[in-house]
Amino acid sequence: MAIELEDLGLSPDVADVMQRLARVGAGIARIISRNGLERDLGAGVGTNAGGDGQKALDVIADDAFRAALEGSAVAYYASEEQDEVVTLGEGSLALAIDPLDGSSNIDVNVSIGTIFSIFPAAAGPEASFLRPGTEQIAGGYIIYGPQCALVCSFGQGVQHWVLDLDAGIFRRMPDIRPLPAETSEFAINASNYRHWPQPIRAFVDDLVAGAEGPRGKNFNMRWIASLVAETHRILMRGGVFLYPGDERKGYERGRLRHVYECAPIAFLIANVGGRATDGCADILTALPDRLHARTPFVFGCASKVARVAAYHDLACEETSALFGSRGLFRS
């Protein structure tokens, strides 16, 4: 046994897949803890299907998860590191995975992770993943940080496990609490401010204005450049995360992948009372048009995400002309 799954009512097939994912996750945690002692896990080794640079650990993780799922109920394996869906067998499930999220942080000892989602297998490989996120059986992640933790939702709340290093087992912890309605943290890469669309600039301007601004309170900005780490913080204490599309070439639809990253995170957030959108429309009801499709991504406390959508509902010229520096909304 690699993870405690009692009392969750999972089907034998899903439970077996979770055991396999947990076993590989524990192994990757051990490999990461020895980075540099035997090999450089952050060494560049090529590019993936999306054109992003691959690190050695990206490939190690992808190979390990794919091998572990052979002989399981997973018929189709879709990975951010693979050009196409890999057919593993005749099973009833399909699994999408970002084997190693945040790999730019490998060499600086910052939390990285694995993001995954499980769907019922459809009639064909791509059809199993080009579907609404509401059809997920499970969505979750493993975070490799000071603790190695696994967080997953099966559609009823969000469950949380921590790796017991001595026993090699993910121990069940209390479930994640519903997200708070109001918090004072937001996460965005502010260095790209000049490239953002006007609604995102206006939203962030109002937060940065603090107690003297239209929101009437001070906010703190966070940015880790690891989606798993950002998600874990928001699940633990609330807030909102923004990765908008912008005017740079290749960034028009943001950089995060709908299938491998955004859909499973959106599933988690929805199951603690939060919301996830592309800035306007809900991620979970959107249909990706290809495996490696990218999307702008805003998620976290429902009220904050709704506020971002409200900024988008106003025309950019109206935003500038009517509100200027006093902001769009009063708190």
Swiss-Prot record:
It comes from the Bacteria. Binds 2 magnesium ions per subunit. Pathway: Carbohydrate biosynthesis; Calvin cycle. InterPro entries: FBPase_C_dom, FBPase_class-1, FBPase_N, FBPtase, Fructose_bisphosphatase_AS. GO terms for biological process: fructose 1,6-bisphosphate metabolic process; fructose 6-phosphate metabolic process; fructose metabolic process; gluconeogenesis; reductive pentose-phosphate cycle; sucrose biosynthetic process. Keywords: Calvin cycle, Carbohydrate metabolism, Cytoplasm, Hydrolase, Magnesium, Metal-binding. Mg(2+) 2 binds at residues 98, 101, 261. One of its GO terms (molecular function) is magnesium ion binding. The keyword Magnesium applies. Mg(2+) 1 binds at residues 80, 98, 100. Its EC number is 3.1.3.11. Its cofactor is Mg(2+). It catalyses: beta-D-fructose 1,6-bisphosphate + H2O = beta-D-fructose 6-phosphate + phosphate. Pfam families: FBPase (PF00316), FBPase_C (PF18913). One of its GO terms (cellular component) is cytosol. It is found in: Cytoplasm. Substrate binds at residues 101-104, 189. Its main location: cytoplasm. PANTHER family: FRUCTOSE-1,6-BISPHOSPHATASE-RELATED, SEDOHEPTULOSE-1,7-BISPHOSPHATASE, CHLOROPLASTIC. Belongs to the FBPase class 1 family. Homotetramer. This is Fructose-1,6-bisphosphatase class 1 2. It comes from Cereibacter sphaeroides (strain ATCC 17029 / ATH 2.4.9) (Rhodobacter sphaeroides).
